[in-house]
Amino acid sequence: MKKKFKKETIAAKAGIASDQQYGAIVPPLYLTTNFIYDELGKDQLYEYTRQGNPTRDHLIAALSDLEGGIGGEILSSGMAAVSLVANILELKSKVILPHDCYGGTFRLFSSLAEKGMLEVHFINQAEESFLSQTISQINPDLIWLESPSNPLLQAVDIRKISEKAKTCSAIVAVDNTFMSPCFQNPLSLGADIVMHSTTKYINGHSDVIGGAVITSDEAILTKLKFWANNLGITGSPFDSYLTLRGLRTLGIRMEKHEKNAQAIVEILSNNAKVKSVFYPGLAHHPSHEIAKKQQSGFGGMLSFELKEGLTGVKKFIEKIELLPFAGSLGGFESLIGHPYTQSHGVHTPEKKEEIGISDGLVRISAGLENTDDLIDGIQSALN
């Protein structure tokens, strides 16, 4: 029986010493657009890079191994990954999404619903009635989960929802971007699909846009491969090469991201100017017990609300020096964000109020800097 290695080893060894031509330790970068046919009329593994490429295959093999899947596709962006999942559905399929889902996901599925292509329902999946009543009432074809959510870090019980989904033959897809394969594996909890914006933690260096979709189901895998090629949204070999290089240090990076996040949470929790702190590692966080049960870590993302609201946010952004104000997350550098105008800016003010995102909310992606430097920088900006 082949030995199953730990995640750090899987990431570090992905594709290593696989070059049979020259014996290179690091797998080569195949920048070619096409491949020579062996003979007329004979199918072969690689024909055209949109359809398949060895560099891209090394990356998806590593991610599939880390997530416990059988395969998947590397895409040109996180939203391309979301689009791919949407495209494997039949016309008029019913889809349930979180009421507080990422703005890009909300915009995509809302647009498809407006065109009459899908029937879409945005629902608070943390409510008890979601499991006991809503799923059965809607009888969905796809349930899309974001656990933990952006930016309030709300977790939902992936295992329970997956079990309920099976009663109506629904596919369960989980956006696992915030946790990475290091801290959560949705397929092992019963989900059918796991999706990542590899732009974030998996690449980890803020220099590549990418996405990934991994599955544990053969029929779904066939559809993913067909539609990724058909839509022309597969990732480039060079981006795959850089992402695989970033993936090799994922384990040790996630440890540091989490350590820094926990230190920041501690000082924010004791600051008089802070109204609330949102981090699943806090015992009083509403999703703490679920997160503790299905995650092996609490991650490097957190958010907090300032008592002064938007005025306080503006002051904080102006005064802080170490943390740039920018979109995205999961890179080596710590970043601050304003969900009200950035990730969830697509929503109306009323919708943002409904899902708990105020204009005084700040999101932090804890990077890899020295912990004391981060704390000093944040405290100075607040005080």
Tell what function each PLM region has.
Residues 2, 13, 74-273, 278, ...:
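Conserved PLP-enzyme active-site core in the AAT-like
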Residues 1-53, 59-62:
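N-terminal "arm"/small-domain region of PLP-dependent enzymes with the aminotransferase-like
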Residues 44, 209, 243-248, 298-302, ...:
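Short amphipathic alpha-helical segments
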Residues 276-362, 366:
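Conserved C-terminal alpha-helix-loop-beta "cap" of PLP-dependent enzymes
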Residues 110, 121, 132, 141, ...:
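PLP-dependent enzyme catalytic core of the Aspartate aminotransferase-like
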Residues 24, 237, 272, 296-299:
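Short gly/pro-enriched beta-turn/loop segments at secondary-structure junctions
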Residues 36-39, 220-221, 309-312, 343-344, ...:
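Short, acidic Gly/Pro/Ser/Thr-rich loop/turn segments
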Residues 34-83, 87-88, 104-111:
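Conserved N-terminal alpha-helix of the aminotransferase class I/II PLP-enzyme fold
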